[in-house]
UniProtKB/Swiss-Prot annotation:
HAMAP family: UPF0223 (MF_01041). It comes from Streptococcus pneumoniae (strain CGSP14). This is UPF0223 protein SPCG_1392. It holds the Pfam family UPF0223. Disulfide bonds: none annotated. InterPro entries: BH2638-like_sf, UPF0223.
Length: 92
């Protein structure tokens, strides 16, 4: 996928909040481009949800991220929840 894209970020977030959201986006990318521990992705998702508690905002960011990257936040989280332990890979 094209690695020259911008993440959907809210510039009103603090540095720590930006780091949490970016960590989650990076873990989703890792799930598609290689492998990532399911627990690591779920932990970063918890950090993301602490910053973005609203389901509608999560969906909006997910759509924007998928549009620019081709990677689905939802599918990555669902795969991690189903796997529980071990690594997940969503790459083709």
């Amino acid at each position: 996928m094209n690695k020259q894209y911008s993440y959907p970020l809210d510039l009103s977030w603090s540095t720590e909040e930006l780091a949490s959201v970016l960590s989650f986006f990076n873990d989703v990318e890792a799930a598609y481009e290689g492998k990532v521990e399911a627990k690591k992705l779920l932990d970063s998702y918890k950090g993301f949800k602490a910053v973005v508690p609203s389901k509608s905002e999560e969906k909006r960011l997910g759509r924007e991220f998928e549009t620019v990257s081709g990677y689905s936040l939802y599918r990555a989280v669902q795969a991690a929840k189903e796997k529980g332990k071990g690594k997940i890979s969503l790459g083709k």
